Amino acid sequence: MSIDVIFLGLDGVLFDTEPPHLAACNAAFATAGLSVRWDARALRKAAATHGYARAINGALPPNLPARDKKRANDMADDKHREFHHAIVTAPPKALPAALALINDAIADGCKICIVTDLPAAAASALLSNAFGTDVNSLFTVVTGGASFDGAPGTGPYARALHAIGVQPSDAIAIDAGTPALRAAEEAGLWTVSIAPAQHGAEVVRPRQFITYEALRELHDSPFSHQAPHQASQIASPRQLAA
């Protein structure tokens, strides 16, 4: 089986956006009049569940009263504005290991797509600063503001694969957020998680980014593959352990 498409997230995958996300969350807390302040560990813990773009939701109770929803939405909007201002003022550079994977994959004939739940304007700012006019030549599809909450087969991964004519079994998604990884798995893609890991009381990020060569070895391993499913069934989630 081939790797025809690799989907990359932006947060924690192509860019280290942790510092601006942390600053944006704390600024939004302050604007909302909340006393809570996060450190990097708290942000990573929330991001592991909600993704970095919506990590601030980790500060909210699971069943938010209706009267508080507008305040919560305003806080999320404030966070997005603070984040956008931060990445425009001090643009983060693309991570070297991710760039190496992109270059190796493209050299092997693989398409690279971007799917992120960051607002489209923020995604555009990050990519434009890092790649300039090469964005359209490097990335086959760029989707910002993606929603990962839809029914399986209807989300951003399924739409992108349909547009470029690739089967889910020939595509891999690499992300640091559970919502994106879950949506990719439900769409039948292989997935690689580089999400922050829980080690006792500590939440830490992976030390290494997977290489394209390692990705191919994992994908081609007979231990990674399951028996074929009938065409009428949705492919079972398949996760490659980096």
Question: What are the roles of these predicted feature ranges?
Answer:
Residues 2, 99, 103, 119-242:
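Asp-based, Mg2+/Mn2+-dependent phosphohydrolase catalytic module
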Residues 3-96, 107:
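N-terminal helical cap/lid subdomain that shapes the substrate entry/recognition surface
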Residues 14, 112, 173-174:
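Conserved SAM-binding loop
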Residues 61, 84, 88, 110, ...:
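A broad detector of the eukaryotic-type serine/threonine protein kinase catalytic domain
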Residues 109-110, 189:
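A short helix->loop->beta-strand "cap" motif at the edges of active sites that frequently abuts
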Residues 114-117:
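Charged linear interaction tracts used for macromolecular binding and regulation
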